[in-house]
Regions:
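Conserved, structured C-terminal
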Residues: 1-208
């Protein structure tokens, strides 16, 4: 690209049909940037930033290292157990994983008329049950969306919770599975290229 060697990947932090371009320190980033802007403008491309696509990351259940999972969690507790092969012998950490709790403690949450405050607590019937690890507003679902980590695995999708929000108030929310929609990953695979013409509000808002 622009006579520069880069890595172009179909992986992404948004679960959308797109591309990631990885630069090297020695790359001429200004030249590459100019080329991308020049060619992109022909297709209506606009410049945006992380906050604009954070919602899709959360809705897709793409966990952020150090935020949604840490060195204090294990793959099973954050819903990544499918990537662990305990039949494989002699790998680092295997014994700890064999003995670990295999139940999931990480779920999505939809919030009524508010955005959950990241790092704040999550309550059920007034009792502390976990914390918010990621959150933002979803213009597509027209509600706050987030990822939570619970203190135990007794509660799960469908549970009505109390969420501390950025407006300083407590709003009601509902735990849900991840991803929140497109469970088969048809969008990122390009098998569903339909672009919604309007939002699809979360129906649960009227029920809470």
């Amino acid at each position: 690209m622009a006579k520069e060697k880069v890595i172009i990947s179909r992986s992404g932090f948004t679960n959308e049909l797109g591309w990631e371009i990885y630069f090297r320190p020695e790359n001429n980033s200004e030249k590459l940037g100019d080329l991308i802007l020049q060619e992109g403008s022909k297709m209506g491309m606009i410049i945006t930033a992380t906050p604009s696509f954070r919602g899709r990351r959360i809705e897709a259940g793409l966990l952020s290292a150090g935020q949604d999972f840490t060195n204090e969690t294990n793959p099973f507790s954050v819903g990544l157990g499918r990537f662990v092969d305990l039949d494989k012998k002699n790998f680092i950490g295997r014994e700890a994983l064999v003995e670990s709790d295999k139940r999931c403690k990480s779920w999505g949450v939809r919030v009524v008329d508010g955005v959950a405050s990241k790092g704040e607590t999550l309550k059920f019937n007034g009792k502390l049950i976990g914390r918010i690890t990621s959150s933002t507003w979803s213009p597509f679902q027209v509600c706050g969306v987030g990822i939570v980590y619970l203190n135990n695995s007794d509660l799960g999708p469908g549970t009505i919770v109390e969420v501390e929000c950025t407006d300083g108030k407590t709003h009601k929310g509902q735990l849900c599975t991840l991803p929140m929609y497109d469970p088969k990953g048809e969008i990122v695979r390009g098998t569903n290229k339909a672009i919604p013409s309007q939002p699809e509000p979360w129906g649960g808002i009227k029920k809470l």
